[in-house]
């Protein structure tokens, strides 16, 4: 089965959030078959920094939805959006 790489933009709910801790929480929340391939940051506004997390998932029905739901359920996450998707 082929795999898909997706860049997910994770917005914390406060500029005071520890991004390293948030990244660890996101990693722990991943569903089976998904893995984080890298994380970058993006300054948004007013001191708020988003995490740009590259996730590798199987190319099956549902795509990144399980990862989006898992990330959205993590404490201190305001929103999750898909920025890019591509086949590997």
Curated annotation (Swiss-Prot):
Q: Which family does it belong to?
A: Belongs to the EF-1-beta/EF-1-delta family.
- The keyword Ubl conjugation belongs to this UniProt entry's keyword annotation: no
Cite the HAMAP family for this sequence: EF1_beta
Answer yes or no on keyword Protein biosynthesis. Answer: yes
Question: Which keywords belong to this entry?
Answer: Elongation factor, Protein biosynthesis
Physiological role: Promotes the exchange of GDP for GTP in EF-1-alpha/GDP, thus allowing the regeneration of EF-1-alpha/GTP that could then be used to form the ternary complex EF-1-alpha/GTP/AAtRNA.
Q: Which domain of life is it from?
A: Archaea
Q: Name one Pfam family in it.
A: EF1_GNE
SMART domains hit by this protein: EF1_GNE
MF terms per GO, please? translation elongation factor activity
Q: What is this protein called?
A: Elongation factor 1-beta
Tell me the lineage of the source organism.
Answer: Archaea, Methanobacteriati, Methanobacteriota, Stenosarchaea group, Halobacteria
């Amino acid at each position: 089965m082929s795999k898909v790489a997706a860049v997910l933009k994770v917005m914390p709910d406060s500029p005071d959030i520890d991004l390293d801790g948030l990244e660890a929480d996101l990693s722990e929340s991943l569903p089976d078959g998904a893995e984080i391939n890298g994380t970058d940051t993006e300054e948004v506004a007013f001191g708020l920094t988003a995490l740009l997390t590259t996730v590798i998932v199987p190319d099956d029905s549902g795509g990144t939805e399980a990862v989006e739901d898992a990330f959205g359920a993590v404490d201190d996450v305001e929103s999750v959006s898909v920025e890019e998707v591509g086949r590997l």
